[in-house]
């Protein structure tokens, strides 16, 4: 199983390499990459099964973010796992935001990686056959409300603007927190911004 790790933190590289080796991946199949240019070349030549990327490698440069977005789109059979660069927050979950793009905390447990990668590790197969989890999506109301919430508007302001009861706003906030698997507003904002950066945003259910 060809794998690429793009993370400037040596501890993370060591941890991921150790995890992959312990799950039977051969050392020669694990490649460390440092730049977006190198990642594009490696993805084209190696067609990796999984790519781990720390968002710090691209998030501060708009052109790098655009290139990462393009690389993800060009390789639908590669699973991209993007680690959030968010400090001092207890969050060890992961979210599938596109069929081949997963946003994860760096605190993800080995057991969770097993759940995600288990079948890919066992068989030389494409990820599309095996990722058995729902893609994160919001209703139109949740999406609109989340944008207002992120713009700093409170429950009463949102209630007035959307012409819905404050209790309904609170209920929608509860749904968003459940879908993004956290009650931490900082994590929610981070997930939204990162998803906006490498995709066209969180899926909105238009029904």
Swiss-Prot record:
The keyword 4Fe-4S does not apply. Degraded by the Lon and the HslUV proteases. Interaction with RcsB protects RcsA from degradation. Residues 131-196 form the HTH luxR-type domain. The keyword Transcription applies. One of its GO terms (cellular component) is transcription regulator complex. InterPro entries: RcsA, Sig_transdc_resp-reg_C-effctor, Tscrpt_reg_LuxR_C, WH-like_DNA-bd_sf. GO terms for molecular function: DNA binding. Keywords: Activator, Capsule biogenesis/degradation, DNA-binding, Sensory transduction, Transcription, Transcription regulation. CDD domains: LuxR_C_like (cd06170). Interacts with RcsB. Component of the Rcs signaling system, which controls transcription of numerous genes. Binds, with RcsB, to the RcsAB box to regulate expression of genes involved in colanic acid capsule synthesis. Belongs to the RcsA family. This is Transcriptional regulatory protein RcsA. It comes from Escherichia coli (strain K12).
């Amino acid at each position: 199983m060809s794998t690429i790790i793009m993370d400037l933190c040596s501890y993370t590289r060591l941890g991921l390499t150790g995890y992959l080796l312990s799950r039977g991946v051969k050392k020669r199949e694990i490649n460390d990459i440092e730049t977006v240019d190198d990642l594009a070349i490696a993805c084209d030549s190696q067609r990796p099964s999984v790519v781990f990327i720390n968002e710090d490698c691209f998030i501060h440069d708009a052109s790098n973010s655009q290139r990462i977005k393009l690389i993800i789109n060009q390789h639908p059979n590669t699973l991209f796992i993007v680690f959030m660069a968010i400090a001092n927050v207890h969050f060890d979950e992961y979210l599938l935001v596109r069929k081949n793009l997963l946003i994860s905390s760096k605190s993800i447990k080995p057991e969770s990686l097993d759940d995600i990668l288990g079948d890919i590790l066992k068989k030389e197969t494409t990820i599309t056959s095996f990722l058995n989890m729902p893609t994160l999506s919001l209703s139109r109301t949740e999406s609109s409300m989340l944008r207002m919430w992120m713009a700093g508007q409170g429950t009463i302001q949102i209630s007035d603007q959307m012409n819905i009861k404050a209790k309904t706003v609170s209920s929608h906030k509860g749904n968003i927190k459940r879908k993004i698997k956290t009650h931490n507003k900082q994590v929610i904002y981070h997930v939204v911004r990162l998803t906006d950066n490498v995709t066209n945003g969180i899926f909105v259910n238009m029904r």
